[in-house]
Amino acid sequence: MQRNPYILRVKRYGNEKNPKLVILLCNPGDDPIKYERLPDYIMYLKGEYKDAGLSLDVGCRYNDWWDDFFNVFKQVNLKPSDVLVLEYYPYHTCDMSLIPNYNQWTDYAKNALSENKKLLSKFMYKNIPVFGYYYSHWIREVPQLKDYKLFYKSRARFKNHKIKELHQFLQEVL
């Protein structure tokens, strides 16, 4: 595999057909130049990597970032297979401030966002709860989120506080 930051991309994880929860993220983190350290790279080596449709159960085996989410899911009797996670930008960056302007995106990235916006709108229409872990980009792209009654905008800065917000939100809506 050559050093190309655009190889290991992630559109979304989880249940694309009938989720009980949608989580909005900004993009996969970590340094794309050091792709050997990415959980996606290990999945790639083991033949389990997918840019979309990857089960959260599989993703969690390779990335402990999800452990806190899984603990919350268990506490509210939500299966990981009931969750859909949408990425705004499908490429890894060290920081979300490094996401380029939309006019500099690849066609793949533009198509991924378009697909994810359609999925989000579809599930909002079906009154599925949406948790905005990172949501500011999403509100610009899907303005009806602002008035969606089952949308929670995380105001916390740190992950452990965001996880507490997720737990409280799920207790209220599930």
Residue spans of the language-model regions?
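Active-site and ligand/interface coordination hotspots across diverse enzymes
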Residues: M1-V58, E115-F123, P143-K149, Q168-L174
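Bulky hydrophobic/aromatic packing residues
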Residues: L24-L25, R61-F70, N77, H137-K146
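C-terminal capping/extension of enzyme domains
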Residues: Y102-K117, S136-L174
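Noncatalytic linker/hinge segments flanking ATPase motor cores
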Residues: V58-F73, K126-F131, L170-L174
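A structural signal for short, well-ordered beta-strand segments and their strand-loop junctions
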Residues: K20-I23, K79-E87, P129-Y134
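Internal catalytic-core helix/loop-beta-alpha segment
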Residues: N63-M124
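Polar/charged alpha-helical tracts
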Residues: M43, D67, N71-Q75, S81, ...
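Short, solvent-exposed loop/turn segments at secondary-structure junctions
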Residues: N27-D31, Y89-T93, Y135-R140, R155-F158
